[in-house]
Structure formats: C-alpha cells, structure tokens
Curated annotation (Swiss-Prot):
Keywords: Acetylation, Nucleus, Phosphoprotein, Transcription, Transcription regulation. The modification N-acetylmethionine is found at M1. This is Transcription elongation factor A protein-like 4. It is found in: Nucleus. The lineage of its organism: Eukaryota, Metazoa, Chordata, Craniata, Vertebrata. Residues 1-125 are annotated as: Disordered. May be involved in transcriptional regulation. The gene is TCEAL4. Belongs to the TFS-II family. TFA subfamily. One of its GO terms (cellular component) is nucleus. Coiled coil: none annotated. Residues 25-96 have a biased composition (Basic and acidic residues). It comes from the Eukaryota. InterPro entries: TF_A-like/BEX.
Length: 209
C-alpha cells in the first residue's frame, strides 16, 4: 500500500511538474503573439493599443500564482519601460517626418524662379575691375573728406597692383610647368642655368649628310 501510495504521489508530482512546464510554454506563446502584434502596431504607429496590451498582460499576471506573478511583473515592467522608450522615439519621428511635407507645400506656393539654387543666383560674370569701377562711382556719393577719398583710391590702386602681380606669378608658374613637362624646351641666352646649353635643334635644323 505504501508503495502504491508513493507511486501515486510520484505520479501526481510528475503530473504537476508537467503542468507547470506546459504552462510556461503556453504563457510564452501569447507573449510571442503579443510581440508580433506589437511589431505590427509599431509599423502602423498605433501607440494607444500598446498601452492596452500592457494592461491586459498585467491583469493576466494577477490571476496567476504569486511566484509566477513576481517573475512576470519584472518582465512586464521591463517591457513597459522599453515600450515607453520606443513610443517616445516613435512619437518624435512623425514630427520630423511632418517637416518635409510642410517644405513641399511651401515649395508649391513659391514661383518657378525661386527653384533655382541660391549659389547659382550669386554667381555673376562681374570681375574685379567692374567692382572697382562701381566702388569709384559710389565713393563720390558718400560723404567722405578729402583725406578719406585719397585713402580709398590708394587702397583701390593697391588692389589692382596685387591683382597684376598675382597674374604675373601665375604666368611664371605656367611657364615653369611647361619647362618641367619638356626638359629640352628651348631656352634663350638669359635662361642659362648652371652652364652653357645650346638651344634645342629640331629635325629640320640638322643638315642632311
């Protein structure tokens, strides 16, 4: 009798274990389903339903034993925090997405001329000489004393000299580049460097033997 009783207890305990093992699996399945639903809701942007599902999970957890309830409460709190963080990020995204729509509306109201990039508008064919000429004309309209007028004209003359010098430097630089490309480039008597070098003789200059 004792053996049968012990066996019955063993069977009952085994059945209890099996039920306990089956319950977590069944409990996990709704969580997986909830996560899939949450993903769908995230894609649709429905944050209100997320709060409802969290409340439903809390109600389900209260009906379960205390040991399981405590474990689930920790999980639900973590999930709730992650949902709150995710919801705040998602709420920020629609606002940022709404801005391009307002820009497109504003662009639709603007005339076609304003569609040209700003940098393209700023580019002009006016050179430094043109600007200096305009500045000379504008100086007469300004209320400058004679000394100030002289200073301004001196500054303009300096600018023109610097421009001319920079052009000369660029010309010399280009000349040097051409010499580097062709080491046998003909040089005049003033360009002798490090000894006497005869100018380059082309094929036509060589006498026929």
């Amino acid at each position: 009798m004792e053996k049968l009783y012990n066996e019955n207890e063993g069977m009952a305990s085994n059945q209890g274990k099996m039920e306990n093992e089956e319950q977590p699996q069944d409990e996990r399945k709704p969580e997986v389903a909830c996560t899939l639903e949450d993903k769908k809701l995230e894609n649709e942007g429905k944050t209100e339903n997320k709060g409802k599902t969290g409340d439903e999970e809390m109600l389900k957890d209260k009906g379960k034993p205390e040991s399981e309830g405590k474990a689930k409460e920790g999980k639900s709190e973590r999930e709730g925090e992650s949902e709150m963080e995710g919801g705040s990020e998602r709420e920020g995204k629609p606002e940022s997405e709404g801005e391009p729509g307002s820009e497109t509306r504003a662009a639709g109201k603007r005339p076609a001329e304003d569609d040209v990039p700003r940098k393209a508008k700023r580019k002009t064919n006016k050179g430094l000489a043109h600007y200096l000429k305009e500045y000379k004309e504008a100086i007469h309209d300004m209320n400058f004393s004679n000394e100030d007028m002289i200073r301004e004209f001196d500054n303009m003359a300096k600018v023109q000299d610097e421009k001319r010098k920079s052009k000369q430097k660029l010309g010399a630089f280009l000349w040097m580049q051409r010499n580097l490309q062709d080491p046998f480039y003909p040089r005049g008597p003033r360009e002798f460097r490090g000894g006497c070098r005869a100018p380059r003789r082309d094929i036509e200059d060589i006498p026929y033997v």
